[in-house]
Amino acid sequence: MPKMKTNRSAAKRFRVTRKGKIIRNHAYKSHKTRKKRRNVLRALRKKDVVSSADKNRVLRLLGKK
């Protein structure tokens, strides 16, 4: 049976921590930032954890499951 291939676009967007959580970046921060509040843009810079509903799908894309 061949090896699982990693989805390269998912590998650039997600990272798995040692405890198994999946870290992602926020959306809506690349353009049209002039109309967004400063504290909103600051919050969008932080990383976020992928929800449990999407966790298995992302792990399959990363070739971890």
From Swiss-Prot:
Belongs to the bacterial ribosomal protein bL35 family. The keyword Ribonucleoprotein applies. Gene3D superfamilies: 4.10.410.60. GO terms for cellular component: cytosolic large ribosomal subunit. The keyword Ubl conjugation does not apply. The gene is rpmI. SUPFAM superfamilies: L35p-like. InterPro entries: Ribosomal_bL35, Ribosomal_bL35-like, Ribosomal_bL35_CS, Ribosomal_bL35_sf. This is Large ribosomal subunit protein bL35. GO terms for molecular function: structural constituent of ribosome. The lineage of its organism: Bacteria, Thermotogati, Thermotogota, Thermotogae, Thermotogales.
